[in-house]
């Protein structure tokens, strides 16, 4: 079977696959690797449901690619919008071959507190947990996949204790990239927790590092000082088609059928932050997150 590398693109990963009759959900489809994931899956015959902060943004993205796509509004900064998106997706009355948690923000200069948490934990982790747990029943029995776009920042930037549970709103101090790192660790730990929960249904869950992609919409939230480093970081970056490769690999390639609870980079298994393998850490993250959602998210 073909081996893919950091240079592989999403289209190369899907080159020999016919995805006709398959359904995929991609969050954050308006730009960057989310848009490329939407485009590549649709180009290979899949029906792709794409979410964005507004219906207009989702529709623009879907209209920009050939193939069968459906736009859905889902502002992950707002739990009410996420719950509305759940209802809209359920109304489609389809089963999904994969749900791809791609939407995210990175290192805004201010914490932007809402629901008692800063924006990165809210947008990147909590809203995905809300969306995925309420839609997990729509994943195909025996073959469905959950794919969470995490990051190497889960290892490189997350605090040594994993998540600052006593400082989720940043009131004890806010370092943008530290909070970004913990939100990406939360994505990884959530995927591992879901792998355990979904195993009995024959559904797999994995997380990934897409690579450093500087031409993505993710950098829109960066502060001025952080932007000064973009040209340097860009020297080590991937193209958007390369950045979407591992996502498409985990979502659709037969090589990873049945493999669950993993962390991948460059379409290969990678070493995760050790906290993600700690069952007690994952349980605490789940319990704290579930409590926040129970308090602030509307009922189904």
Regions found by a protein language model. Give the residues of each.
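C-terminal helical subdomain
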Residues: 2, 183, 207, 230-272, ...
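Rossmann-fold NAD(P)H-dependent dehydrogenase/reductase core
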Residues: 2-217, 295-300
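Pocket-edge positions in alpha/beta enzyme catalytic cores
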Residues: 50, 74, 235, 274-277
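A generic structural signal for short coil/turn motifs at secondary-structure boundaries
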Residues: 109, 272-275
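Mobile gating loops/cap/lid regions near enzyme active sites that modulate substrate access
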Residues: 222-223
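Amphipathic terminal alpha-helices
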Residues: 280-300
């Amino acid at each position: 079977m073909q081996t893919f590398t950091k240079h592989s693109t999403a289209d190369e990963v899907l080159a020999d696959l016919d995805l006709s009759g398959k359904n995929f959900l991609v969050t954050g489809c308006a730009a960057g690797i989310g848009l490329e994931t939407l485009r590549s899956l649709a180009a290979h015959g899949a029906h792709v449901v794409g979410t964005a902060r507004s219906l207009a943004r989702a529709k623009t993205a879907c209209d920009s690619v050939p193939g069968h796509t459906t736009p859905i509004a889902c502002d992950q900064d707002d739990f009410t919008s996420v719950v509305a998106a759940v209802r809209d997706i359920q109304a489609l009355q389809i089963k999904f071959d994969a749900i791809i948690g791609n939407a995210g923000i990175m290192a805004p200069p201010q914490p932007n507190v809402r629901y008692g948490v800063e924006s990165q934990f809210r947008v990147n982790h909590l809203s995905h947990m809300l969306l995925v747990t309420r839609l997990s029943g729509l994943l195909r029995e025996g073959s469905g996949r959950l794919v969470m776009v995490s990051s190497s920042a889960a290892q490189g930037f997350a605090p040594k204790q994993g998540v600052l549970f006593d400082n989720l709103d940043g009131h004890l101090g806010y370092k943008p990239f530290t909070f970004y790192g913990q939100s990406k660790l939360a994505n990884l730990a959530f995927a591992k927790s879901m792998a355990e929960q979904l195993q009995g249904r024959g559904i797999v869950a994995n997380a990934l590092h897409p690579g450093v992609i500087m031409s993505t919409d993710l950098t829109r939230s960066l502060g001025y000082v952080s932007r000064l480093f973009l040209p340097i970081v860009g020297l080590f970056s991937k193209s958007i088609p390369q950045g979407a490769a591992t996502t498409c690999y985990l979502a659709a390639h037969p090589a990873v059928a049945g493999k669950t609870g993993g962390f991948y980079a460059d379409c290969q298994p990678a070493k995760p932050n050790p906290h993600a393998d700690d069952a007690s850490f994952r349980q605490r993250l789940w319990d704290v997150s579930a409590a926040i959602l129970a308090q602030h998210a509307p009922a189904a």
